[in-house]
Amino acid sequence: MLPAAAAAASLWAPRLGLRGARLRLARQQVPGVCAARQLSSSSQRRSEALAGAPLDNAPKEYPPKIQQLVQDIASLTLLEISDLNELLKKTLKIQDVGLMPMGGMMPGAVPAAAAAAPEVAEGEDILKQKERTHFTVRLTEAKPVDKVKLIKEIKNYVQGINLVQAKKLVESLPQEIKANVAKAEAEKIKAALEAVGGTVVLE
């Protein structure tokens, strides 16, 4: 039995030795494989991060809500801008459009309100002109060549005045021709006086 066992051992020894060598080689290769996998994973994550980062020269895209808000504001009339300005000042507690932004305010609210202020003021002036129903007709200038015609025309609109008084009136301009006149009549007087060389303003 001993010679048979020795023969079997000598037969399997080379195979066992080869298997052990393979195991040692595999163990040596495992760290390298892991390192390669880590490097590949890190490179992939870096590529994904670069792909997701926005480019500096790419145009900024604004949310639809902001775009719609800008379009709505741009379509407002002067009166609506005035109401918006007033409501913003009340909501954001802005005392003066010239003040620096206070805590809790939207960025750019004060500059936007300040930029809209001249347009709002102009719109309010136009509104006041539209709301007025009575005017004062005032003669401010007269052409020398047309003074005679102008004097006669003034006599038609100023009660109780004679030609001498009308002449003195024309020579000492500006003078009030008629006060508290309805819009239609004021425009009629203005047109008549301007037709004979006068310069008229409605106040």
Curated annotation (Swiss-Prot):
InterPro entries: Ribosomal_bL12, Ribosomal_bL12_C, Ribosomal_bL12_C/ClpS-like, Ribosomal_bL12_oligo, Ribosomal_bL12_oligo_N_sf. There is a cross-link at residue 155 (Glycyl lysine isopeptide (Lys-Gly) (interchain with G-Cter in ubiquitin)). Residues 1-39 form a transit peptide. The modification N6-succinyllysine is found at residues 155, 167, 183. Keywords: Acetylation, Isopeptide bond, Mitochondrion, Ribonucleoprotein, Ribosomal protein, Transit peptide, Ubl conjugation. It is found in: Mitochondrion. Belongs to the bacterial ribosomal protein bL12 family. Component of the mitochondrial ribosome large subunit (39S) which comprises a 16S rRNA and about 50 distinct proteins. Interacts with NOA1. As a component of the mitochondrial large ribosomal subunit, plays a role in mitochondrial translation. When present in mitochondria as a free protein not associated with the ribosome, associates with mitochondrial RNA polymerase POLRMT to activate transcription. Required for POLRMT stability. This is Large ribosomal subunit protein bL12m. The gene is MRPL12.
